[in-house]
Amino acid sequence: MTGLCPLHQPSPLDHPHSGGTPMQNLSQLDVKGKRVLVRVDYNVPVGDGVVQDDTRITASVPTIKKLLDGGASVVLMSHFGRPKNGPEDKYSLKPVAEAVSRALGQDVKFIPSLPGSDETLQAVQALRPGEVALLENVRFEAGEEKNDAALNDKLAKLGDAFVLDAFGSAHRAHSSVSGVAGKLPHAAGGLLQSEVDALGKLLHAPEHPYVVIIGGAKVSDKIKVIENLLPKVDRMLIGGGMMFTFIKARGGQIGNSLVEDDQLDLAKGLLEKYGDKLLLPTDAVAADKFAADAQSKVVPADQIPDGWMGLDIGPDTQRAYADALQGAKTVFWNGPMGVFEFDQFAAGTNAVAAAVGSLKDQAYTVVGGGDSVSAINKSGKADQIDHISTGGGASLELLEGKELPGVVAMA
């Protein structure tokens, strides 16, 4: 997996997402003796007051340490969950502060007042170089998701400079992402820079052959990515529930499988235009019900029996997709091949994880999307992937060709 690059030089890629100019990077920011406000993504799973998965926290450590080594004090700012009516205990970042302290190996002061309050301002003004504070959930502020001008001003007072290192939130035009950036000297953190560079390669400078694997339940969720990438790729392998919309569009029988009838014409059009590039499953694992203990059997993907539903790609397709990946120079995988949560329908996803992982040193490989990331971690191949994206919605919007407000703000 790609490490973070806190000493990153300006990106050589000319990203349209960043207004055609590279983002400002940390080495261009003078931080000695300054208080730096850092937007991180600490929207992590918490159970019984304890962080269950600290991946996003550890991913932010190199940027924080670089700032501390440069003589700064650091004020960390994040959202957590979707609180609707101001402060709620279950959405407090307090338990996260302890996990950040552990990851950094130093004390992190938690500031429980609202981020835009006078109390918070006084608390951060007392920080000395080398010290770190974590603000309370920025979504407790009513103006955050509205990119409220008054809140932007209040947040800007918390730092002498601003660093955006929350790629997972870079597609949101919120106060803590793009609003405050216009008020302070700013730069992209190492995590944001590595994400934009890695995904930028998929759009602007892919080596060929270029193979993309797209899975997941719905065509409608991924259609803009599919349409934007198809002209650029050599092969696109389709899996997951969305495969049945394509198979039905081609006249196949799909039984009770998931289908989006309102996407059939679109799927038909893509098959007519890019049929030579689009690879669909030839067999599927069908089940008599949507359950972990369902009866299952392997059938042709376009002959799912009535009353049955396809829940994974079959063994022939697994082999065909592994073969299609051989010789590739660039590979992007987003979305599971089947109902990965049920063990008996996880084989297709695991097979793709193994195939992508086996390409180390032969191809530039990027994996994005929660289930595909879980699968690559579970397969033990994560360290063989060039870049594992933490982005979710932000990754997809970038690959749709959209400008991300946070990335634009860092130019």
From Swiss-Prot:
EC top class, as a word: transferase
EC number from the UniProt entry: 2.7.2.3
Residues the record lists as binding ATP: 222, 310, 341, 369-372
Predominant localisation class: cytoplasm
GO biological process: gluconeogenesis; glycolytic process
Highest rank taxon of the organism: Bacteria
Catalysed reactions listed for this entry: (2R)-3-phosphoglycerate + ATP = (2R)-3-phospho-glyceroyl phosphate + ADP
The keyword DNA-binding appears for this protein: no
Keywords: ATP-binding, Cytoplasm, Glycolysis, Kinase, Nucleotide-binding, Transferase
Annotated substrate binding sites: 41-43, 56, 79-82, 139, 172
Compartments (UniProt record): Cytoplasm
SUPFAM superfamilies, per database record: Phosphoglycerate kinase
Alphabetized Gene3D superfamilies for the sequence: Phosphoglycerate kinase, N-terminal domain
Signal peptide residues on this chain, from the entry's feature table: none
GO CC aspect terms: cytosol
InterPro entries linked to this entry: Phosphoglycerate_kinase (IPR001576), Phosphoglycerate_kinase_CS (IPR015911), Phosphoglycerate_kinase_N (IPR015824), Phosphoglycerate_kinase_sf (IPR036043)
Pathway entry: Carbohydrate degradation; glycolysis; pyruvate from D-glyceraldehyde 3-phosphate: step 2/5
GO molecular function: ADP binding; ATP binding; phosphoglycerate kinase activity
Family: Belongs to the phosphoglycerate kinase family.
Subunit text: Monomer.
PANTHER family membership: PHOSPHOGLYCERATE KINASE, PHOSPHOGLYCERATE KINASE 1, CHLOROPLASTIC-RELATED
Protein name: Phosphoglycerate kinase
Gene: pgk
